[in-house]
Amino acid sequence: MGLRLTTKVQVSGWRFLLRRLEHAIVRRDTRMFDDPLQFYSRSIALGIVVAVLILAGAALLAYFKPQGKLGGTSLFTDRATNQLYVLLSGQLHPVYNLTSARLVLGNPANPATVKSSELSKLPMGQTVGIPGAPYATPVSAGSTSIWTLCDTVARADSTSPVVQTAVIAMPLEIDASIDPLQSHEAVLVSYQGETWIVTTKGRHAIDLTDRALTSSMGIPVTARPTPISEGMFNALPDMGPWQLPPIPAAGAPNSLGLPDDLVIGSVFQIHTDKGPQYYVVLPDGIAQVNATTAAALRATQAHGLVAPPAMVPSLVVRIAERVYPSPLPDEPLKIVSRPQDPALCWSWQRSAGDQSPQSTVLSGRHLPISPSAMNMGIKQIHGTATVYLDGGKFVALQSPDPRYTESMYYIDPQGVRYGVPNAETAKSLGLSSPQNAPWEIVRLLVDGPVLSKDAALLEHDTLPADPSPRKVPAGASGAP
């Protein structure tokens, strides 16, 4: 009896009946107007193919680049202990931090995680690295360099006020409670027994006992200076003392053709469409002065004049005009109350492309940072400031002495500055394009060790103990 072969039509019909039976069981519908079940089988087939490809790729990766094995790099991390090791001349050396390892290798390599059994196959050397160096050197993003130094005085009304210094390296939060000084505002401060007045330009020495000067400036007799820190004193530019330059031969008759009662050193005025203009008589001419200078000159010596006499403009224009270098501003000042506005800040900012930095003096009720950033402050142990940073900084400082080149520093998020000797060292740490920063503020940060390759290649038995550590505050997690 011969074999009876099936035809394609029979096979197709059999498959159709099976599909129809599936629809009857799963969907309870045998009409088969559509066939959604076909997608299930296709997805299963596709999933199997993808799984096979993934397994094949994993097998190839494990063969050509096995995990936990030596080879391909000289920087390793023990998978069991997380100890960092660097391979030097066939010896495996423990290293204190990633920064030291990168300095040793000369490139910003990342460690490969290796099994302890693999590391034990290599001869072991002494620990190398720079004690006290940062573990790594991350840098916060941003094209604008902003550095701010703030003094906050507590108990300003008392006989022993306390000054707290803060270093801020992050964008500022400026609002009505803390904002830049206006041209008519000033702050009275003291440093080492001397009195200074701080304006938008900087600090000026002033003698509060000179009532002729202070009354013309609108400084009340009840105004009292409050102390500032050494860092703030050095950061604020010295704009010279606020005192009137002496006038030679003051009180002598003039030889300029003016009335006899206008002796040298006296003040007169002319009326213009913009208001009165004041002039002081000098030995060889006259000099225009602002209203505050005129008031100060008259309060010092009025030369018998009850009020500045008015002169005819046509007479004045025929007299030689000179310059009287008065440092006083154009209008009386409003003295900021430190008990109400205890924070005094000097801010330095330079953006990419700026030819020179911009500095601003601010005053207000609190530090110019957000409330959330207030909790980020780090009170340094060996420094005098509390530091607020939004990440690491790589900065370049230009020395005012032309004999010296610029200095580069890496500043970690804890506010410790580390010297970077040159651009090659910076490159090995993954640092580039340093931002400018003011030495007046950076100098207040705690100075860490220099990050150099020679220092990283030194071997150590143990780390020296910190001679003056600080106990963790009570109430902190894990503290007694």
Curated annotation (Swiss-Prot):
- Species whose genome carries this gene: Mycobacterium tuberculosis (strain ATCC 25618 / H37Rv)
State the similarity comment: Belongs to the EccB family.
What's a Pfam family this protein contains?
T7SS_ESX1_EccB
Principal place where this protein is found? membrane
Q: Name one GO cellular component term.
A: extracellular region
Region entry Disordered: which residue ranges? 461-480
Q: What is this protein called?
A: ESX-1 secretion system ATPase EccB1
Give the GO terms filed under biological process for this record: symbiont-mediated perturbation of host innate immune response
